[in-house]
From Swiss-Prot:
Family: Belongs to the TatC family.
Gene Ontology CC entries for this record: TAT protein transport complex
Signal peptide (from-to): none
Subunit comment: The Tat system comprises two distinct complexes: a TatABC complex, containing multiple copies of TatA, TatB and TatC subunits, and a separate TatA complex, containing only TatA subunits. Substrates initially bind to the TatABC complex, which probably triggers association of the separate TatA complex to form the active translocon.
Function: Part of the twin-arginine translocation (Tat) system that transports large folded proteins containing a characteristic twin-arginine motif in their signal peptide across membranes. Together with TatB, TatC is part of a receptor directly interacting with Tat signal peptides.
Gene name for this UniProt entry: tatC
Keyword terms: Cell membrane, Membrane, Protein transport, Translocation, Transmembrane, Transmembrane helix, Transport
Source species: Azotobacter chroococcum mcd 1
The protein's name: Sec-independent protein translocase protein TatC
Amino acid sequence: MTARPDSDQDMPLVAHLTELRSRLLRSVAAVLLIFAALFYFAQDIYALVSAPLRAYLPEGATMIATGVASPFLAPFKLTLMISLFLAMPVVLHQVWGFIAPGLYQHEKRIAMPLMASSVLLFYAGMAFAYFVVFPIMFGFFASVTPEGVAMMTDIGQYLDFVLTLFFAFGVAFEVPVATFLLIWVGIVDVASLRNSRPYVIVGCFVVGMVLTPPDVFSQTLLAVPMWLLFEIGVFFGARIRHREEPAASDGPSQP
């Protein structure tokens, strides 16, 4: 069996805690630096994020602020969350630097691409929500507004709504990584996942039903990408399994 690095085995607990503290501080510093750079543009960032809704507001209608501090707090909160999202590569790099010494070499070869793909897929999920889901969703909401009701959304409630969807779609797009990990660590095998494909498809549509307006088109916009991402995870999980099986069979046999 491949031994873990001696440097990791010999490090005392205090050294581990000191390194953890240092990496946490670097992660926080990265978030704060990005926030400081973006804070001047906080109003513009909020205008950009609210554009999908404002495009469907009736002529002359605007968003409203029901709280005294909402005009300041909503852009502030949004900019802070955007800073956290943008700092994810730095945060994951610090996480990688902390856990890498304790990994086997073959684990390192897989872990780094998984972390990078996790970030990219999370960003892809957010972009999909903004460019595809939001226009359809807000267009639907505007079309079903009862007659005599003015559609004037509070900026704080809108922010909470879109942040929830950003996070939901970002996590939903992590399906390939989750599927790959389940196969790689041996919790499930490829055959079981392929046999459960009908249940996965139904589950994707259930998630789509929960996260999108109650129309088939919007549900399909989320369900189909989730299913395709699941298939991608199964495909790469099967490939890594096929690579590892010959390596295991070629290993030294016990006398």
